[in-house]
Amino acid sequence: SHPFVEHFKFVKALEDENTVAKLTIPAPAQFIEQMIMPFALENTRKYYADNRELAEDIAACYKKFIADVYAAGCRNLQFDDCSWGMLVDPMACMYFGTDEKGLETIKEQLLELNNAAISGKPDDLVINTHVCRGNFHSTYANSGAYDGVAQTLLARENVNAYYLEFDDARSGGFEPLTAVSGDKKVVLGLVTTKRALLENKDGVIARIHEAAKYL
């Protein structure tokens, strides 16, 4: 089995009546993204003639892993997914070696892959997505509001909740939250880890109320 399953078992043993162990893993979309970007595509094409066959294999591997970690007791699984942050960045076309139309195709491919990996999951398994924007050496990897992925990620990804970074102006406003569908939850990242200075408490509370207007 995957070594992450053993890692989870270690954390699971520390649970008590007030805690639920959560496992975080790279999202399927994050996985394929790294294989279809220009720097990797030539090597990927040695093994996969197109992205669909690659996505099918990735989805199958994730479904097997999800089943294994569920059997180990996991009931809260988080996809860490930098791909959506990259897709809204002003440099997205350069990152992916395509134009705006090509970006729309990639968005659909990533959404389809994530949903394929999730499909058939047990009803009592919570799966969330964290849209990570990078935090290497306390700096960010990409910028851009969520508007460009609202109708794919927020409206149509079949997760239970989104963990979204809104800790500075780079992430845009809360308006895209109107696209969140169904009874999905949103966890707001309003307190940054990129600097030591704490946010103003009243300011954070005000931003929570502002975000609530769109949900």
What kind of feature is each model-predicted range?
Residues 1-215:
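Domain-level signal for soluble alpha/beta catalytic cores
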